[in-house]
Amino acid sequence: PRQQILPIFLAQNDPPRQDRPVGDDVIDAEYPVTKQLTDVYEKFGNGVVGVQEVPREDVPKYCTLDVTPLEKNVMQVHDMLEKPSLSEIMSCYSILGRVVMPPEIFGIIENTPPVNGEVGFTAAMNTLAKQGRLNAVDFIGNRFDMGNKLGILKANCEMGLRHPELKDDFKAYLKELVSKL
């Protein structure tokens, strides 16, 4: 029942009693997204989720958040729902790519009942939200969705074109490949 959150759960004692940054997408940003989130974590002392606005029709692929602005690109999260129907959308802000959780998340996970046989990380984070202990950062950066094949290919191409040791050979390869299309 804990497959979705198993990697997070296994990290609870390594090292003990520290905040936990977690990410599952590649994000290209001058100001690293994890740093954007940890700065807010240190300022407010709450869990923090990295969010961006997505097109309304894409929200059901992710989650929806009920938020109020705090400052610049920082919001207070009041509620969230994973994979909502179009009629359940609270906003077009969705959690994308990064979160920083306080150590208490492990106790919350332990006490979160499974839904459809699975303990969801979103449900555990929503407990923090309902306690007023979750912030959202509308992060600055270009996100590559590692949840789909095209996102993986785009990230590899973009990063390959910037890699100091590979960029010239990779660019030549891409030009040759494109000429054959």
Residue ranges of model-derived segments:
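Alpha-helical scaffold elements within enzyme catalytic domains, especially in hydrolases
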Residues: D39-V40, T127, E176
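Conserved beta-loop-beta/alpha segment of the NTase-like Rossmann-fold superfamily
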Residues: P1-T64, I109-E110
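Intrinsic disorder at enzyme termini
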Residues: F170-Y173, L177-L181
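Catalytic-core segments of class I nucleotidyltransferases/pyrophosphorylases
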Residues: P69-A172
